[in-house]
Regions:
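Hydrophobic/aromatic-enriched cytosolic interaction surfaces used to assemble or bind macromolecules
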Residues: 1-313
Length: 313
């Protein structure tokens, strides 16, 4: 089964607020970094494109950047599915930085009621806007996953901050994901060293993007495995997470089946079938018109015969 994994653009709300800029235009042209894979492990193609130009695939996964997800660890309330979101809000409302109605929540996979579980929080309007923009271009997202999530063993990934110069101070950041949460901090200053236990756990998996590898090895004092963005997107796609829960849950199976059938029917491979069906419809219309014309002539002939018989009588 072919898989398309795309990275959602960075949520710029906080940056716009800080600079008193206007909110981004909903109709702006979005460019998506993407990768395709047949097995979810090795990528076949990669690049960036507008939504309408993205490759088609059997499954589409959207990845949310680590800085666009907040994490809350709670005791999962015991509530029916229809009331679970309200129960979650009741537990973490005081910890939310914004109004609960503007936040989308998602529960960790395999979470058990009454036990500790992680809840992901994302700006609802922003995520809905991104999903709508993709859907309008014919890209239907099956799953939404975080780029990083609380996990064991710990993982540290070095990469360049959005729109930053990798050679500039603070250009390189570290995303530290472990059992106690996820945090992304700049390498300059002491916050990164304070965040990571010293010495780091021996089981820690260290990776870096190609542009951040040198800074990562200087900071860490040890070699790191280079992981391009394409591999990192596939890694995120293999997780069990799915942020499409509650009000953002995907459509029903019936609607999805109809949508997938329509998408397949409009694909280039089905063009001969479409042409054949169109020709069949045209032939049927022409045939019906000829039959109607023939029937009309027969009726008129009978009418003329009856009129002639009446005159003779």
């Amino acid at each position: 089964m072919s898989t398309l994994v795309i990275q959602l653009p960075e949520h710029r709300r906080l940056r716009a607020r800080a600079t008193d800029e206007a909110a981004p235009d909903p109709g702006r042209r979005r460019e998506y970094v993407y990768v395709t894979s047949a097995d979810g492990i090795e990528f076949e193609a990669q690049g960036d494109a507008a939504a309408a130009l993205l490759p088609r695939a059997s499954q589409v996964i959207a990845v949310v950047r680590e800085t666009d997800v907040a994490w809350h660890r709670i005791t999962l309330p015991k509530a029916p599915a229809s009331r679970l979101r309200a129960a979650l809000v009741g537990v973490i409302e005081d910890a939310l930085l914004e109004d609960s109605e503007s936040v989308h929540l998602a529960v960790a996979p395999l979470a058990v009621a009454g036990e500790q579980a992680w809840v992901a929080a994302v700006d609802r309007a922003w995520l809905q806007d991104e999903l709508d923009a993709l859907q309008k271009s014919g890209v239907f997202v099956d799953r939404v996953v975080p780029m990083a999530w609380p996990d064991e063993p710990p993982m540290g990934h070095f990469h360049v901050a959005e729109s930053a110069d990798p050679a500039a101070p603070g250009g390189t950041v570290l995303t530290w994901a472990h059992l106690d949460g996820v945090a992304t901090v700049r390498l300059d200053g002491g916050l990164a060293h304070a965040l990571v236990p010293q010495p780091p756990p021996v089981t820690t998996r260290w990776t870096a993007s190609p542009t951040a590898a040198v800074a990562a090895e200087q900071w860490l004092g040890a070699p790191v495995m280079v992981m391009p963005l394409e591999q990192r997107l596939l890694q995120a796609g293999r997780s069990l997470w799915n942020l499409r829960q509650f009000e953002l849950a995907r459509k029903t199976r019936g609607a999805r089946a109809a949508r997938d059938w329509l998408r397949q029917a409009m694909s280039p491979a089905w063009r001969p079938v479409r042409i054949g069906l169109a020709a069949l419809v045209v032939a049927q219309i022409v045939g019906l018109n000829l039959w109607a014309f023939h029937q009309k002539n027969e009726v008129q002939a009978r009418r003329n015969a009856i009129q002639a018989l009446v005159k003779q009588s």
